[in-house]
Amino acid sequence: MSKKLGNNSKKIAFVHPDLGIGGAERLVVDAAVGLQELENEVTIYTSHCDKKHCFEEVSSNLLDVEVYGDFFPTNVLKRFHILFAIIRQFYLVLALIFTGKIKQYDYFIVDQLSFCIPLLCCFSRPECKILFYCHFPDQLLALKGGFLKRFYRMPFDLIEEWTTGISDQIVVNSKFTKGIFHKTFKGLKNIEPGVIYPCVDLNSATDTEEDKLMDEEVNEFFKGGKFFLSVNRFERKKNIGLAIQSFAKFKAQLPKNVSEDNRIKPRLVVAGGFDPRVLENVEYLQELNGLSESLNLKCFTIRGKLLIIPPATDILFLPSIKSSLKKSLIKNAELLLYTPSFEHFGIVPVESMLFKTPVLSANNGGPLESIVHFTSDNIATATGYSQEPNDELWSKTMHTFYTELDEATKLKLGENGLTRVHELFSRHQMSEAFMQNLIQSNSKDEEKGILYGILKMWRIELLFVLISYYLVRLYK
């Protein structure tokens, strides 16, 4: 639970839409814990949090979490998601206004949805600063549609740009996202967002008893055989087919006495998030099975405990694996194949480097900032490969890594990865970056435009107070 630990501590509140177990939620939890470790008092406000489906730091009450507005629906007939997300966030902030909690904080950190920022600016203390963490512009994450969908989205996109721009400080998760920010929000060209990279838990590099047991299970299952690894959700945008096609061409380059000997041939393991209720997950796994068979690769799927694998298997699918198995697979893999293109950041390559496994990724998006491409003259710092997402190039890189690199070089790449994670992607580094950006927040009211000035007029404030009072009393 959050506690005030010193005279120099600040009161910091996060405003987040849905505190589940996604990547954005992992960042919020890590940032909150990190800022708490820096002797600040931290609270997370959210519209939804299921204590049975959240991160341990939340379920254990290490962090203070308060929920407002969970009774609102998230959609109607699977439509109007953005509208209801705004309504839920709007209600949350109105609750903070009515209860007076909004006046308690030195800083607010808002992420994903920026629509509440004007209210926070108007009703928080004059010296309070608002930081917005832009994982990616929401309008680019929305599913594309026809004219009516574009017409429906237009006001939300305009409001997103305006509300984002009136925050006191804006940060993004990578330099790549920073470039997308400038291309998307053309009206904010004078704003230069900071960059705060997501982090990984350095403590997870230390094996627990469960990890040791899982390592034994994995080693017994593969019986010393080598394997390449892909870890992604089973979604088409993750381009997992690239790993399968590259593996097929890599296998074709091996001598037949290796590629056809079931005792020593390398395999490809495709693991990741899978929900049988999500149609795309189910369809995509079927498509990947079909692709494997079309390339004359024998595939096998295991759900649950690793018990037995047919000796002839080339590709092993492991949908919906638990964290300890994911960790063990990464540690024991020859090379991690990270197939998505134009990822905003991409935490999986960083996790792989934490466990000293080199990475092969597409040469675009966020992974260009985490992976140091290996060339003949940078063995002191290289952590893997960044290549065009082309199966010919990838298969050649896999072949070079598998057949030409000695163990000392592979170990050095792994050690370099761990060093880079400690230098750039630790929770301490991230929380320090958040604190510095909060301290440097310096936007002034006169820089926020005429509309913001009108919003701050006392009549508008009174109207919002009355609305908040009515809604809170109505649904309390």
UniProtKB/Swiss-Prot annotation:
Q: Name one GO molecular function term.
A: GDP-Man:Man2GlcNAc2-PP-dolichol alpha-1,6-mannosyltransferase activity
* Record-annotated membrane-spanning stretches: 80-100, 449-469
Pathway field of the UniProt record reads: Protein modification; protein glycosylation
Q: How does it sit in the membrane?
A: Multi-pass membrane protein
- Provide the protein's localization: Endoplasmic reticulum membrane
GO annotation, biological process = dolichol-linked oligosaccharide biosynthetic process
Family named by the database record = Belongs to the glycosyltransferase group 1 family.
- Could you tell me what this protein is called? Alpha-1,3/1,6-mannosyltransferase ALG2
Q: Lineage of this protein's species? A: Eukaryota, Fungi, Dikarya, Ascomycota, Saccharomycotina
User: What is the name of the gene encoding this protein?
Assistant: ALG2
